[in-house]
Amino acid sequence: MMTRKPTSVGEILQEEFLEPLSLKISDLAQILDVHRNTASNIVNNSSRITLEMAVKLAKVFDTTPEFWLNLQTRIDLWDLEHNKRFQQSLANVKPALHRHDTSTFAM
């Protein structure tokens, strides 16, 4: 389990891309062809990035969609690992491989 929350998509976007290029959120929105609120929500970590947004960000900043999606996935996993309700539910999940009758999984 990760102890420190991973750097967010918004932080990376702001510090590594927007600031060095002197871009504002409104500039990013125009470049991405999205509403300013959409760009603001991403930069301020109020919303997750979608597959479509990852592809757009990759094109704009000459990266890959996987770069952006991996950042988002790391945050999502960290959030789940630290979500008590989910962890309680997960404790009730049993591995299928420990079942006595494995014939239902045979091909």
Curated annotation (Swiss-Prot):
DNA-binding region: 24-43
Alphabetical list of InterPro entries matching this protein: Cro/C1-type_HTH, Lambda_DNA-bd_dom_sf, Toxin_antidote_HigA
CDD domains in UniProt: HTH_XRE (cd00093)
Claim: Transcription is one of the keywords in the record: yes
GO MF terms, alphabetically ordered: DNA binding
Signal peptide interval: none
NCBIfam families on file: antidote_HigA (TIGR02607)
Protein name stated in the entry: Uncharacterized HTH-type transcriptional regulator HI_1251
Organism: Haemophilus influenzae (strain ATCC 51907 / DSM 11121 / KW20 / Rd)
Phylogenetic lineage: Bacteria, Pseudomonadati, Pseudomonadota, Gammaproteobacteria, Pasteurellales
